Regions:
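Small-residue hotspots
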Residues: 134-136, 143, 177, 184, ...
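Conserved N-terminal diphosphate/IPP-binding helix and adjacent helical/loop segment
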Residues: 2-166, 214-228, 356, 378-385
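Acidic, Mg2+-coordinating active-site segments of isoprenoid diphosphate-utilizing enzymes
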Residues: 28-32, 102-111, 115-119, 145-167, ...
Length: 385
């Protein structure tokens, strides 16, 4: 058995952060989503709680935690991220790795299985190298999640904490993220598959490019992103939110020696699932049941882009001015009500359904199985608003 499996540290550091950077977390109906995940974990024989427990017991995480304690009392994002890992681990659904495992099991062994694969012991229909890939995928996402917690010190105020503490938090975010990413790269090399390494390496490059081009959540008047269309949105969201899952699914097929057609189908599933969930996430501020809840959303989110394209730039700028308070801050509750009067929200829902259906379509050629059904349930869950 490949011993790399037990050496990957901190795989469970996932999906808890700020600034709307969560992916495939519980944005759909809690009971429905949790059941989908629980059923899927039983199928792959790989509960996410086990991954989190091994992470929490690792020496590396213990050392990081000791330093992060120095940030207590500040508003540095790294502290909240770390708190989420420890105290909200039940919600840390490592969905990228879970999807990779389900895809591996659904596709099964290839007809072109080589001798080196035959010698590997499959567990629950999944090769050890594919399980390692699932953990590597989680580790890469975790590294970028930690990196996104870096604070712009130009916006620092005394209420955030001392400048020295915020600088220290930034250093910890950079070093911790780099450490996790280095471990992921080491794990990639141990897969001994150049095509898989190439795919995941390109996904890392996509993440860097996507995050670089990501717009801030709340934009000023001179940076409203009027030139951003849904085509641009999809390109940027795929780089920052979809490339890792899509290429990890494809790499899982490569590790089992599946042909290019199967690899392409796995890639399409990951791509459409990612975009579907991102749309679901951006819909949440507009479909919450309680209108009294405080609400914020990106002015470059899909519902806003659709709305802007419907009403035109001139009317959109007028609506923005009307939604501003005396202090020139945007009243997002008022702006949300304005946007909901048009078709932006329903258009986003339609696009979400489209990506869900395309994800479902991409796996229909796989043999009927519990794993395929679980993938279908996950794709359907992103349309539960």
């Amino acid at each position: 058995m490949n011993v790399f499996f037990s050496r990957l540290p901190c795989i469970g550091l996932l999906n808890r952060g700020q600034r709307n950077i969560r992916f495939l977390t519980n944005t759909t109906t809690p009971s429905n989503w949790n059941k989908v995940v629980s059923d899927a974990e039983k199928i792959v024989g790989y509960p996410t709680s086990f991954m989190s427990m091994r992470c929490l017991l690792s020496d590396e995480l213990s050392n990081v935690a000791m330093h992060v304690r120095k940030l207590v009392g500040t508003k540095h994002p790294l502290l909240n991220t770390a708190r989420g890992f420890v105290y909200e681990s039940r919600n840390n659904l490592q969905m990228r790795g879970l999807v990779v495992l389900l895809m591996s099991k659904a596709a099964g062994p290839s007809q072109h299985t080589t001798s080196d694969l035959i010698s590997q012991d499959m567990v629950s229909g999944i090769y050890p190298s594919q399980r390692n890939l699932a953990e590597i995928t989680e580790l890469i996402h975790t590294a970028f999640l930690v990196h996104r917690g870096i604070v712009n010190l130009k916006e620092w105020t005394n209420s955030d904490g001392t400048l020295k503490d915020m600088q220290f938090g930034n250093k910890m975010a950079v070093l911790s993220g780099d450490f996790l990413l280095a471990n992921a790269c080491t794990g990639l090399a141990q897969l001994n598959n150049t095509k898989a390494v190439e795919l995941i390496s390109s996904a890392i490059g996509d993440l860097v490019q996507g995050i670089y081009h990501e717009m801030p959540n709340h934009l000023e008047d001179n940076s409203l992103g009027d030139d951003i269309t849904m085509v641009t949105w999809e390109e940027q969201m795929f780089l920052s939110h979809g490339a890792l899952l899509a290429k990890s699914c494809q790499a899982a097929m490569e590790l089992a020696k599946h042909d290019k057609e199967a690899q392409g189908l796995a890639y399409k599933y990951g791509r459409h699932l990612s975009l579907g969930h991102k749309l679901n996430s951006e819909l949440q501020p507009f479909i919450k049941s309680s209108s009294t809840d405080p609400v914020t959303f990106s002015l470059n989110s899909a519902p806003v882009i659709f709305h802007r394209q419907t009403v035109g730039q001139e009317k959109w700028h007028h609506q923005l001015q009307q939604a501003k308070t005396i202090g020139r801050q945007i009243d997002y509750t008022k702006l949300r009500s304005t946007i909901k009067l048009e078709d932006g929200v329903t258009s986003t829902m339609d696009l979400c359904h489209y990506h869900s259906s395309k994800a479902l379509e991409s796996i229909q050629s796989f043999p009927s199985s519990e794993a395929r059904s679980a993938l279908e349930n996950i794709a359907s869950a992103v349309t539960k608003f």
